[in-house]
Regions:
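Acidic/histidine-rich catalytic cores of soluble enzymes
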Residues: 1
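Short, intrinsically disordered, charge-biased short linear motifs at domain edges
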Residues: 42-51
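Conserved catalytic-core motifs of eukaryotic protein kinase domains, centered on the activation segment
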Residues: 41-42, 144
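A cytosolic small-molecule/anion-sensing beta-strand core signal
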Residues: 31-32
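Small-molecule pocket liners
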Residues: 27, 46-47, 56
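ATP-binding/phosphotransfer module of carbohydrate and carboxylate kinases, centering on a glycine-rich
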Residues: 6-13, 35, 50-175
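Short glycine-aspartate micro-motif
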Residues: 16-20, 26-28, 59, 132
């Protein structure tokens, strides 16, 4: 998050929420070019906000965490639950994006709804100048049109125009 805020897609914004969606879901909050850790060092930990009470079990012990709906492994698991054969996230999208079946359309629709609800909660609370998406799942192209539209549907303000941008520095920016 810090590298993107200082040198990447967020360099022209004062308040940046950096999102990581990959094997897990996490984030970082940058305020005026400084990382905000919070008192308990959990600021930005949106992957463990509850999206669905009594939802899917998370490794953290809680139920219904965002991570259990948005991470790459959760997407692959849900695909199998819908009756699809075990595939990687990349294989699912490559196989069905241009030739969708009923399972793929349901899988995609649920992901977009969950992405929209989860990220809009962050925007409603933090009200950042920009959100930068990173991690392997951020490479899904439909996040940048339909995903953003799903976020906008859930924002409190009908004037929201918070930029939701792909990262510029790649997955190794924090190294």
């Amino acid at each position: 998050a810090m590298a993107e805020a200082l040198l990447g897609a967020g360099k022209n914004y004062a308040i940046v929420f950096g999102v990581i969606i990959g094997t897990g879901v996490g984030g970082g909050l940058i305020l005026n070019r400084r990382i905000h850790h919070g008192r308990l060092f959990i600021a930005g930990e949106w992957g463990h906000q509850i999206l669905y009470p009594n939802g899917r079990k998370c490794y953290c012990g809680k139920m219904g965490c965002v991570e259990t709906y948005l991470s790459g492994p959760s997407l692959e698991k849900y695909w199998v639950e819908l009756g699809g054969k075990p595939l990687s996230l990349e294989e699912i999208i490559e196989s069905f994006e241009h030739n969708p079946n009923v399972e793929y359309l349901k899988w995609r629709k649920e992901y977009l709804a969950n992405f929209g609800m989860a990220l809009s909660n962050v925007i409603n609370i933090v009200d950042p100048d920009a959100v930068i998406l990173g991690g392997g799942v951020s490479n899904i192209s439909f996040l940048y049109d339909e995903g953003i539209a799903a976020v906008r549907e859930n924002i409190f303000s009908n004037k929201d125009d918070t930029p939701i941008l792909p990262n510029k520095l790649g997955d190794s920016a924090g190294v």
